[in-house]
Amino acid sequence: MKVIALFFLFAFIFCTLEVAIVEAGFGCPLNQGACHRHCLSIRRRGGYCSGFFKQTCTCYRN
């Protein structure tokens, strides 16, 4: 029973790290300014880091 619990714990941690690597971008989660500048560069009004642990750069609509 303990082996199964440890397996699921490691699987959960691995999946969480994989999601973080895939979704992190444009400065998020540590540099919200980079996300904002990216959004400005694609002709949006700006942007911010949102989502789970602020890992997704979300741009404001024009």
UniProtKB/Swiss-Prot annotation:
Disulfide bonds join C28-C49, C35-C57, C39-C59. Residues 1-24 form the signal peptide. Keywords: Antibiotic, Antimicrobial, Calcium-activated potassium channel impairing toxin, Defensin, Disulfide bond, Immunity, Innate immunity, Ion channel impairing toxin, Potassium channel impairing toxin, Secreted, Signal, Toxin, Voltage-gated potassium channel impairing toxin. Highly expressed in non-venom gland (hemolymph) and moderately expressed in venom gland. Its main location: secreted. One of its GO terms (cellular component) is extracellular region. Gene3D superfamilies: Knottin, scorpion toxin-like. It is found in: Secreted. GO terms for biological process: defense response to bacterium; innate immune response. GO terms for molecular function: potassium channel regulator activity; toxin activity. Pfam families: Defensin_2. Antibacterial peptide active against Gram-positive bacteria (including S.aureus ATCC25923 (MIC=2.5 uM), M.luteus AB93113 (MIC=2.5 uM), and the antibiotic-resistant S.epidermidis PRSE P1389 (MIC=1.25 uM)), but not against Gram-negative bacteria (including E.coli and P.aeruginosa). Also has weak blocking activity on Kv1.1/KCNA1 (8.7% inhibition), Kv1.2/KCNA2 (10.2% inhibition), Kv1.3/KCNA3 (9.0% inhibition), KCa3.1/KCNN4/IK (9.1% inhibition), KCa2.3/KCNN3/SK3 (46.3% inhibition) and Kv11.1/KCNH2/ERG1 (16.9% inhibition) channels (tested at 1 uM). Belongs to the invertebrate defensin family. Type 2 subfamily. This is Defensin BmKDfsin5.
